[in-house]
Amino acid sequence: MEPIRVIESRTVVLPRENVDTDQIIPARFLKVTDKKGLGKALFSDWRYAADGSPRPDFVLNRPEAQGCSILVAGDNFGCGSSREHAPWALVDAGVRAVISTRIADIFRNNALKNGLVPVVLDPASHAKLLAAPGASVRVDVEAQTVTLPDGSTAKFPIDGFARYCLLNGVDELGFLLAQDADIAAFEGGRR
């Protein structure tokens, strides 16, 4: 995992509320264990017609959405069943942060473990982002702030250990393995 300190990007806005993990990536795509390529299945039932052709009216298929790495979502994003494939698909599609007023706990934890920054903002700040699709936004993981299109900043909470892992580009196992010498010294002192 690469360290994530700051994400600067234009936003893509998906204002739908209660987007569950089955809408993020339908169950038929969960048979794989490789993260690569899952971005093509992201929001598949919304992005593609029955014949597989892209729906031009879906926000991620529009030319202005290309290259955007910050998704501004409606309230209660990532609800539903626990599937790690949901953040995998978002990251594989180039999304680095999801901003909402509420992000489901299980999705948030899976996102953090996979290098996707879940940002929960107050409703007023979130409304500014919903009203400005394509705006340039800055997510600062270190400062725990989002710089909004009008230049103001909004704070967001993030678990301290998860923040450490994002800033240092390690997952939980990588963190534990990096402590090997200290663990061995501690265990050696107990004998």
Swiss-Prot record:
Gene3D superfamilies: Aconitase, domain 4
Reactions catalysed, as given in the entry: (2R,3S)-3-isopropylmalate = (2S)-2-isopropylmalate
Matches recorded under Pfam families: Aconitase_C (PF00694)
EC numbers: 4.2.1.33
Keywords carried by this UniProt record: Amino-acid biosynthesis, Branched-chain amino acid biosynthesis, Leucine biosynthesis, Lyase
Enzyme superclass (EC): lyase
Pathway(s) where this gene product acts: Amino-acid biosynthesis; L-leucine biosynthesis; L-leucine from 3-methyl-2-oxobutanoate: step 2/4
Domain of life according to the entry: Bacteria
Stored SUPFAM superfamilies: LeuD/IlvD-like
Cellular component annotations (GO), alphabetically ordered: 3-isopropylmalate dehydratase complex
GO molecular function, one term: 3-isopropylmalate dehydratase activity
GO biological process, one term: L-leucine biosynthetic process
Function noted in UniProt: Catalyzes the isomerization between 2-isopropylmalate and 3-isopropylmalate, via the formation of 2-isopropylmaleate.
Family as reported in the entry's similarity comment: Belongs to the LeuD family. LeuD type 1 subfamily.
Subunit structure of this chain's protein: Heterodimer of LeuC and LeuD.
Alphabetized NCBIfam families for the sequence: leuD, PRK01641.1
Descriptive protein name: 3-isopropylmalate dehydratase small subunit
Organism this protein belongs to: Anaeromyxobacter dehalogenans (strain 2CP-C)
